[in-house]
UniProtKB/Swiss-Prot annotation:
PANTHER family: NICOTINAMIDE-NUCLEOTIDE AMIDOHYDROLASE PNCC, NMN AMIDOHYDROLASE-LIKE PROTEIN YFAY
CDD domains cross-referenced by the UniProt entry: cinA (cd00885)
Listed transmembrane segments: none
Name this protein carries in UniProt: Putative competence-damage inducible protein
Organism encoding this protein: Streptococcus pneumoniae serotype 4 (strain ATCC BAA-334 / TIGR4)
Family under the similarity heading: Belongs to the CinA family.
SUPFAM superfamilies xref list: CinA-like, Molybdenum cofactor biosynthesis proteins
Length: 418
């Protein structure tokens, strides 16, 4: 089924309101296996709406119109659709009864002929009751095309879609999706590696999305059950993860988790809890961002003992007992400093892990290091590891955010290697 969404309302075209209905509808239609091919907005103009309906009827099998069902003169969606289909408007008894009750309970409200229009539907349409408003929606099939009219206010449209429309559109298959999350590889490289799978996809499909510091892949398939979907998605997932980078590294090494809400931080926090281990942090350029991210999760007192924000050389020396002369010799942005910060954070809090971050967030370079240079240390029983990452060409906020992601990834790898 090819679906098309037409938003009716001059206020959308003038930017007075944002068309959030289209996003909501597209998402919900996709969940039941209905593909949306077109989204259009048109003003409150009969001629232009008639023209758009003519186009939509030729290219789509499901045409959904939102907005223009109210009591004002410029609310003309149902009237225009009826004219296009050569049908009359008729009253829906249930919607009329709701109008009667509404005005009976509000004797001070003037009931005008325009109010009555809210209870009308196109002749032959199945009414879609409005749970939170007065304008009734409708669903009608003519010449192989299904037309749907929905109210514009999201508070009225959403329950009508969820409770009235979707059950009437349900087919034997639904859309099932799985999200793979990758860190440490860019979108362009990932897309190049997966070019054959992307270019030749039919069902299941995969779509890459770049976010700050990471890339996600959405795998989707139409199936009649979750079990059937899992079989198809498992095959595609393994095909993806079996691929290698140009350096011969498996994509499995970059895939850290699944789902829309999953993050490197959530993975690390849950794994620390599972293993019963603790962590402390010493931060310079990130100024406590790693620790604040840990604290976003409930129940972290069992795994997070505390930490240090040591922005200046003097505070690194005073709070972490690192000799100032050593810091001056090696520089605050150095492998040495990251190592000592991590080791001292671990030692002073008696934690299983000590993580440190020091570097150049920008906009100016520091100690000869360009913006985006970051050293991250991880101290544990087996010793201390320090990595250097270069996060160039980013804003100050992005450098700090991505540096914290690298820190969580370093801890994640250590936890998985135990």
């Amino acid at each position: 089924m090819k679906a098309e969404i037409i938003a009716v309302g001059t206020e959308i075209l003038t930017g007075q309101i944002v068309n959030t209905n289209a996003q909501f509808l597209s998402e919900k239609l996709a969940e039941i296996g209905v593909d949306v091919y077109f989204q259009t907005a048109v003003g409150d103009n009969e001629v232009r709406l008639l023209s758009l309906l003519e186009i939509a009827s030729q290219r789509s099998s499901l045409v959904i119109l939102t907005g223009g069902l109210g009591p004002t003169e410029d609310d003309l969606t149902k009237q225009t659709l009826a004219k296009f289909l050569g049908k009359a408007l008729v009253f829906d008894p249930q919607a009329q009864e709701k109008l009667d009750i509404f005005f009976t309970l509000r004797p001070d409200y003037a009931r005008t002929p325009n109010n009555e229009r809210q209870a009308q539907i196109v002749e032959g349409a199945i009414p879609l009751p409005n749970e939170t408003g007065l304008a009734v929606g409708g669903k009608l099939e003519v010449d192989g095309v299904t037309y749907v009219v929905l109210p514009g206010p999201p508070s009225e449209l959403k329950p009508m879609v969820l409770n009235q429309l979707l059950p009437k559109l349900m087919t034997g298959s639904k859309l099932y999706s799985r999200v793979l999350r990758f860190f440490g590889i860019g979108e362009s490289q990932l897309v190049t590696i997966l070019a054959d799978l992307i270019d030749n996809q039919i069902d299941p499909t995969l779509a890459p999305y770049a976010k700050t510091g990471e890339v996600t892949l959405r795998l989707s398939t139409k199936a009649s059950s979750q079990e059937e979907a899992n079989q198809a998605l498992d095959i595609l997932e393994n095909q993806i993860l079996d691929c290698q980078t140009f350096e011969g590294i498996s994509l499995r090494d970059f895939c850290y988790g699944y789902g829309e809400e999953t993050s490197l931080a959530s993975i690390v926090v849950e794994e620390l809890k599972r293993q019963g281990k603790t962590i402390a942090a010493a931060e310079s350029l990130t100024a406590g961002l790693f620790q604040a991210t840990v604290a976003n999760f409930s129940g972290v007192s069992s795994i997070f003992k505390g930490g240090f924000v040591t922005y200046s050389l003097e505070e690194k020396s005073r709070m972490l007992d690192i000799p100032a002369k050593n810091l001056e010799e090696h520089g605050v942005v150095s492998e040495f400093t990251a190592q000592k910060m991590a080791e001292q954070a671990r030692s002073k809090t008696q934690s299983d892990f000590g993580i440190s971050l020091t570097g150049v967030a920008g906009p100016d370079s520091l100690e000869g290091h360009p913006v985006g240079t970051v050293f991250i240390g991880l101290a544990q029983d087996q010793g201390t590891e320090v990595i250097k990452v270069n996060i160039g060409g980013r804003s100050r906020a992005d450098v700090r955010h991505i540096a914290v992601m690298h820190a969580f990834n370093l801890v994640r790898k250590a936890l998985l290697s135990d």
